[in-house]
């Protein structure tokens, strides 16, 4: 017996509405963060760079500085500030190492790990050097 038209396939994965909403919020926050960085003179080199180590939300360059930016969207900027955990920092650092290996032309740049905090009805807060590779 075959499934009728429109019936879900056995291997199809359906995302929960909460996950879909979180994904859309994340994309929106990353777009706001990228626009903010561009307005501040950065050039966006990559967005959502994925590796086995983790994901970098934004890789941005300004002059000889390379910023790996983690974007956090929460109900308040304070909540967002606490959302970058030490474990996540290590995953971002690992992903940054992979990015640098695949983009050796940037190896001599100054490196910085930033956080961009996003909350409704607030300007983004850019935390320069939110963490470093020694943490």
Swiss-Prot record:
Pfam families for the chain: UPF0102
Domain of life of the source: Bacteria
GO MF terms held by the record: nucleic acid binding
Signal sequence residues: none
Stated family: Belongs to the UPF0102 family.
Full protein name: UPF0102 protein Nham_0146
Species of provenance: Nitrobacter hamburgensis (strain DSM 10229 / NCIMB 13809 / X14)
Lineage: Bacteria, Pseudomonadati, Pseudomonadota, Alphaproteobacteria, Hyphomicrobiales
